Curated annotation (Swiss-Prot):
Keywords: ATP-binding, Magnesium, Nucleotide-binding, Transferase, tRNA processing. It comes from Syntrophus aciditrophicus (strain SB). This is tRNA dimethylallyltransferase 1. InterPro entries: Dimethylallyltransferase (IPR039657), IPT (IPR018022), P-loop_NTPase (IPR027417). Its EC number is 2.5.1.75. Substrate binds at residues 12-17. Belongs to the IPP transferase family. It is an enzyme of class 2 (transferase).
Length: 305
């Protein structure tokens, strides 16, 4: 069956965007981002948007789902999936096979594994009525509504318990906003992988480049614009540790060292997620390093024209 979507996934610093841009130029295609942080405006260096990479030989490659919301907006996987489906169908309607590129495993899985989701709003009245209840009582309430709990960690954390009760109480009611019927997706999925030592070196080099490019100033300006330090931590490792440095809670050297260590650990977690996707039936064709010719060879005869 001919494929109608090319996917290029990989851990941070693997060079997947550069490969995707080259491919988009050769196929006259367009890129759709699968990155949970690049949706935010004004967060460029820390999220690794590398917008210059979308220009190749003087040609600008169209890209979607980048810079679409402000940092104070709570973007989520439900909204990502909905927006992706709209992008996918619109691009495909013009006779173009889109290229999905990114490393946010949850977003990739939501699309490729066809997650069926229901968006449940917070119930402030319910939360107010339960705020004085002890943990044991909240556990009892949840188990009374849904005796079979799939995620037992919901029973151990107060915040997760309240959210689980909200969702359980809404289950089966009318008026819920459900994820849209998904279009038929026939993906050809490529994964970019590197030798572990080489990937560590790439991560360290890219962090050094980002710090030189003004990462610290970016975080400082975001905070001065009204984004709290706590909120900045939500956006990931770079914003968390640079924020700690700007608050004089660690030295520059300590910040750089901790960032390198934790970004490497994050890359390992990304690789673990990709293996999980394979176990769930997603076939991934692995490309060693940035071997563009190997990627092109695998594409032959597979794409919808």
């Amino acid at each position: 069956m001919m494929k109608n979507l090319v996917v290029i996934l990989g851990p941070t610093a693997s060079g997947k965007t550069r490969l995707a841009v080259r491919l988009a130029r050769d196929l006259k295609s367009e890129i759709v981002s699968a990155d949970s942080r690049q949706v935010y405006r004004g967060m460029d260096i820390g999220t690794g948007k590398d917008l210059d990479e979308y220009r190749i030989d003087g040609e600008e490659i169209p890209c979607h789902l980048i810079d679409i919301v402000d940092p104070d907006y709570d973007f989520n996987v439900f909204e990502y999936q909905s927006r992706f489906y709209r992008c996918f169908e619109e691009i495909l309607s013009r006779g173009i096979v889109p290229i999905l590129v990114g490393g946010t495993g949850l977003y990739l899985s939501a699309v490729l594994e066809n997650y069926r989701m229901v968006q449940v709003p917070e119930n402030l009245d319910l939360r107010e009525s339960l705020k004085a209840e002890p943990l044991e009582r909240l556990q009892q309430i949840l188990l009374e509504i849904t005796p079979r709990i799939h995620n037992t960690t919901d029973l151990l954390d107060r915040g997760r318990l309240l959210r689980a009760i909200e969702i359980a109480q809404h289950s089966g009611r009318r008026g819920l906003r459900e994820s849209p019927e998904h279009p038929r997706i026939e993906p050809l999925v490529f994964g970019v992988r590197w030798n572990r030592d080489l990937l560590r070196k790439r991560i360290a080099l890219r962090l050094k480049e980002r710090l030189s490019a003004g990462l610290i100033d970016e975080v400082k300006e975001l905070h001065q614009s009204g984004i709290s330090w706590d909120r900045l931590e939500f956006f990931g490792l770079e914003y968390r540790y640079v924020g700690l440095y700007l608050q004089s809670r660690m030295s520059y050297r300590e910040m750089a060292e901790k960032l390198t260590i934790h970004i490497c650990r994050f890359a390992k977690r990304q690789e673990t997620w990709f293996r999980r996707m394979e176990r769930h039936g997603i076939e991934i064709i692995w490309i060693e390093g940035d071997d563009y010719e190997a990627l092109k060879e695998q594409l032959k005869g597979n794409l919808r024209s």
